[in-house]
Curated annotation (Swiss-Prot):
EC identifiers of the protein: 2.5.1.6
Gene3D superfamilies registered for this protein in UniProt: 3.30.300.10, S-adenosylmethionine synthetase, C-terminal domain (3.30.300.280)
Name under which the protein is recorded: S-adenosylmethionine synthase
Lineage of the organism: Archaea, Methanobacteriati, Methanobacteriota, Methanomada group, Methanococci
Assigned protein family: Belongs to the AdoMet synthase 2 family.
Length: 403
């Protein structure tokens, strides 16, 4: 039986704190681009391994670096003169040795990785020409395994690759939810169709002071859709109005203040050719941005571990961060739970469904006791440990988002 501990959290609920800060780096931010590429490569490798070998082989593609290019954005349309450089590194199984046939099966890791990276960028930064404005360099380290070991591994519970931990919390606060929904709105297909000048490089910083939430939004614009400074200001105003309307739905009862591109000056505005600052010297790296729940939350417990690109089979930095958030969300739905924090610790070499400890901390509503909630919380935690394969499968197919 798993070592599950459910206890009272002696802390002020997040909504009652006088101050709260929440951040989200949008899908076009250089750090998020790296997260997205790393995860897309992992998902693509999982698919290739399953098709060719019947099992997902060892890989970690969480080492993606982006070096910013050089561009000359201009009202009405400019040019990228030096391409963005993306380095894919990490480790992956490129060879499988079949002892019975005395032959080595070679797997197209590099081709799959580069194609996955390019396809992700093409679908994410829609105004970037992936044929000429970006260079993808694959330097993923090679590894090999024995064919017999592949099938032995597929039929057993994976062992933890490290002694590490994952962290999750639920439910999202009003500020957390609003920050996440704001970026998702501005990067939605509907908004891109309505206001094509809005780029994908969007960062949302939320500050709550009592019942007032201030959103500061850095939003790239695409120069070919902006013909004058007046048009640029109109685009900002439209984006601001959209966010203010959104806030009525997700932050009813709060005073909302929205700022867009506060660094603008008379001779400097957030204008890009492609919709991302990566075109103009802004670098990126995996794990420097959003946590596994899609947010950066300094007022909550967080893991510093990068989730994207790690293998979904036994890498604790991925599995347990995702699992902790899933368990926290389910426990938070129990009647009487105000807030839930989950921490899961592994022990290297032990089965991933047998953590050293799974710690659940609860803030309860008035009139409820932790002892009343503990059985249901235990049941939820045990269910997900027993069904960890479901989480792994959803990670393999990209169904679960990691940033």
């Amino acid at each position: 039986m798993a070592n599950i501990v459910v206890k009272k959290l002696n802390s002020t609920p997040i909504e009652e704190l006088p101050v709260e800060i929440v951040e989200r780096k949008g899908i076009g931010h250089p750090d998020s681009i790296c997260d997205g590429i790393a995860e897309a490569v992992s998902v693509a490798l999982c698919k290739m391994y399953k098709e060719k070998m019947g099992a997902v082989l060892h890989h970690n593609t969480d080492q993606v670096e982006l070096v910013g290019g050089y561009a000359y954005p201009s009202l009405g349309g400019g040019d990228i003169v030096n391409p963005i450089y993306v380095l894919l590194s990490g480790r992956a199984t490129t060879e499988v040795f079949d002892k019975e046939k005395c032959e080595t099966i070679r797997l197209p890791v590099g081709t799959v990785a580069v194609n996955a990276a390019r396809e992700y960028i093409k679908n994410t930064i829609i105004n970037l020409d992936v044929e000429k404005d970006i260079v993808v360099d694959c330097r993923i380290g090679q590894g090999s395994v024995d064919l017999v070991g592949v099938f032995d591994r597929e039929n057993s519970i994976p062992l933890a690759n490290d002694t590490s931990f994952g962290v999750g919390h639920a439910p999202f606060s009003t500020t957390e939810n609003l920050v996440l929904k704001t970026e998702q709105l501005l990067n939605s297909k509907e908004i891109k169709k309505e206001i094509p000048a809005i780029g994908e490089d969007i960062k949302v910083m939320g500050l709550r002071e009592g019942k007032k939430i201030t959103l500061t939004i850095a939003m790239a614009t695409v120069d070919k859709y902006v013909n004058s400074v007046e048009e640029y200001e109109e685009i900002k105003a439209k984006a601001k109005a959209k966010v203010e309307e959104l806030a009525k739905e997700y932050a009813d009862g709060y005073e909302i203040e929205v700022f867009v591109n506060t660094a603008d000056s008379d001779n400097c505005i957030f204008l890009t050719v492609s919709g991302t600052s990566a075109e103009m010297g802004d670098d990126g790296s995996v794990g420097r941005g959003n946590r596994a729940n899609g947010l950066i939350t300094p007022f909550r417990p967080m893991s510093m571990e990068a989730t994207s690109g790690k293998n979904p089979i036994n890498h604790i930095g991925k599995l347990y961060n995702i699992l902790a958030n899933i368990i926290a969300n389910d426990v938070a739905k129990i009647e009487g739970v105000n807030e839930c924090h989950v921490r899961i610790l592994s022990q290297i070499g032990k089965p991933v469904n047998e953590p050293k400890i799974l710690d659940i901390e609860l803030i309860t509503d008035e009139g409820y006791d932790v002892a009343d909630i503990e059985p249901k919380a235990n049941e939820i935690a045990e269910y997900w440990l027993n069904n960890i394969e479901e989480v792994r499968e959803k990670l393999m197919t990209g169904e679960i988002k990691t940033f």
